[in-house]
């Protein structure tokens, strides 16, 4: 058997063993995809014992390409929400999550200086303690750029594996500890979260209002400031028994019923100006109007603003809502359309069909993957990661590397959405498949390289010490920030658990947090809010630590 065939066969065996290990769960918690690392260690141990030689160049390529695939697909997935998560609504959550990352880096630095832990080892412990595989790849990349011998770089994977198990268990223990210390009633916390959502600005709602303000009688909708803003959409108007789709030039009369869409505060302000909220139904049932959802799949409308498409003037159709990446938004006239956006339309059947033809509404297109943008994005990301940044006082030029470059490029492209006929939307199933393939390839190679010396290091070397260092890196930031968030910020317990899981980019921890309450979405919401920024910082942190310590030592 050739070296290439043998290497591929061994990698396939590692994936099978590792994924089987990852599927083993104790009380609902398992290693998940991290099991591939331990599958690689097991197979690597026996491969080393048998004296089998694998293709080193091929293993190196597979490891790096797997990492690129993983971080790129993460960036495409979270890109649309990344910059939004940095705004005020998620600012507090992100600040606490960033504090966890910073404290983890500080604890790592202190352990490195006090116990003189070799740089590759301490970076591996850090990556394993925070259960972040891209951090491992980024650390190995910068160490190679700094000229670290290959055998020392491979130690990083071994120390990562030592610290990884408590990295997963530590966050679960922290959640349990917070619940114990503060005597949390999970049901009460879930109700508080639902109440805060209902009173906040995060949900798009509707309101039916009767026109009672005499100053509005015989005025056009476009002349009423609250109705001519991008905060409120008037999607239906009922006069006597006639339901119609209003246009900006529609004249309002006293007694008209308006169906408005917007955020709760804006709807309340509109009600104060216009008249009284009523329970009268403005349903399209039994009328010649209907409400339908259509999806943007036509490349010709990508990047165009809603106002430029003139749907109301041309087709007598109103867009009442816009759903992007699962988030309901008011259909602002300045909003630019992206591939996969879902529009809520109100109008006559023939008119809605005409608009659907314009925007595409081809469901099968949502399941297709444009491979050209994928490789353009990966290529640009690798180029970005290879650009040297010379900083005075540092021994080598800083680079984003093969982990940071594709991630940042994917975040940017995911946020842009499309350029001309190229769009960076990727079906969730395709994104997940590429992401899982990438991380399996990466972890399989890391495990194989670490497996030969793993048992000796654990039983006769410093493996137990590495585990102890990892416990400090995991526990100190999580417990400290958990206490601060609960005591001083009065953070909801379920929101806190999601934030802690997101700060460690740990899906098993998110699954555990979700199981705390069957119906509350608090944990998922906070996890998704902090995940993009934290993933970026987790990849950058080991590179900064490596360059700083290399310069000092």
Swiss-Prot record:
PANTHER family xref list: K(+)_H(+) ANTIPORTER SUBUNIT KHTT (PTHR30445), TRANSPORT PROTEIN YIDE-RELATED (PTHR30445:SF3)
Q: Between which residues do disulfide bridges form?
A: none
GO BP, one annotated term: potassium ion transport
Q: Which UniProt keywords apply?
A: Cell membrane, Membrane, Repeat, Transmembrane, Transmembrane helix, Transport
**Annotated localization:** Cell membrane
Give the source species: Salmonella typhi
Provide the GO MF annotations for this entry.
monoatomic cation transmembrane transporter activity
InterPro entries noted in UniProt = AAE_transporter, RCK_C, RCK_C_sf, Transpt_YidE_put, YidE_YbjL
Quote the protein name from its UniProt record.
Putative transport protein YidE
């Amino acid at each position: 058997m050739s070296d290439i065939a043998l290497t591929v066969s061994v990698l396939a065996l590692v994936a099978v063993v590792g994924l089987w290990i990852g599927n083993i769960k104790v009380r609902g918690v398992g290693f998940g995809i991290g099991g591939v690392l331990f599958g690689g260690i097991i197979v690597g141990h026996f491969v080393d014992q048998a004296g089998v030689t694998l293709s080193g160049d091929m293993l190196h390529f597979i490891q790096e390409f797997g990492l690129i695939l993983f971080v790129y697909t993460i960036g495409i997935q979270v890109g649309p929400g990344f910059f939004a998560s940095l705004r005020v609504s998620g600012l507090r959550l992100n600040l606490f999550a960033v504090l966890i990352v910073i404290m983890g880096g500080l604890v790592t630095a202190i352990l490195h200086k006090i116990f003189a832990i070799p740089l590759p080892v301490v970076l591996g412990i850090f990556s394993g303690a925070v259960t972040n595989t891209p951090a491992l790849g980024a650390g190995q990349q910068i160490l190679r750029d700094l000229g670290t011998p290959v055998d020392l770089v491979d130690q990083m994977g071994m120390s990562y594996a030592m610290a990884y198990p408590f990295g997963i268990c530590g966050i679960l223990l922290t959640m349990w500890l917070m619940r114990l210390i503060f005597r949390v009633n999970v049901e009460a916390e879930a109700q508080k979260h639902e109440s805060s959502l209902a009173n906040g600005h995060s949900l798009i709602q509707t309101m039916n209002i009767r026109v009672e303000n005499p100053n509005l009688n015989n005025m056009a909708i476009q002349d009423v400031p609250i109705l001519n803003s991008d905060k409120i959409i008037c999607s239906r108007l009922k006069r006597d028994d006639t339901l119609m789709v209003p246009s900006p030039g529609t004249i309002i009369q006293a007694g008209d019923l308006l169906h408005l869409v917007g955020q709760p505060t804006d709807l309340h302000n509109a009600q104060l100006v216009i008249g009284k909220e009523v329970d009268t139904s403005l349903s399209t049932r039994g009328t010649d109007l209907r409400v339908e959802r259509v999806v943007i799949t036509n490349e010709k409308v990508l990047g165009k603003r809603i106002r430029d498409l003139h749907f109301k003037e041309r087709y007598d159709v109103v867009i009442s809502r816009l759903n992007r990446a699962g988030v309901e938004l008011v259909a602002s006239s300045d909003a630019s359309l992206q591939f996969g956006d879902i529009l809520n339309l109100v109008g006559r059947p023939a008119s809605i069909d005409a608009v659907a033809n314009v925007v595409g509404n081809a469901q099968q297109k949502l399941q297709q993957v444009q491979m050209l943008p994928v490789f353009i994005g990966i290529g640009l990301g690798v180029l970005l990661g290879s650009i040297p940044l010379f900083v005075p006082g540092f021994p080598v030029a800083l680079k984003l590397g093969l982990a940071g470059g594709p991630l940042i490029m994917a975040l940017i492209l995911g946020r842009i959405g499309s350029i001309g006929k190229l769009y960076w939307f990727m079906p969730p199933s395709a994104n997940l498949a590429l992401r899982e393939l990438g991380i399996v390839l990466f972890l399989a190679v890391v495990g194989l390289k670490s497996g030969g010396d793993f048992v000796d290091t654990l039983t006769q070397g410093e493996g137990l010490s590495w585990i102890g260092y990892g416990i400090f890196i995991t526990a100190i930031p999580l417990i400290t920030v958990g206490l601060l968030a609960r005591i001083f910020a009065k953070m909801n317990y379920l929101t806190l658990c999601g934030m802690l899981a997101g700060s460690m980019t740990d899906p098993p921890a998110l699954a555990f947090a979700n199981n705390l309450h069957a119906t509350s979405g608090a944990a998922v919401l906070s996890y998704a809010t902090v995940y993009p920024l934290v993933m970026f910082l987790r990849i950058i942190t080991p590179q900064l630590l490596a360059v700083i310590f290399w310069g000092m030592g």
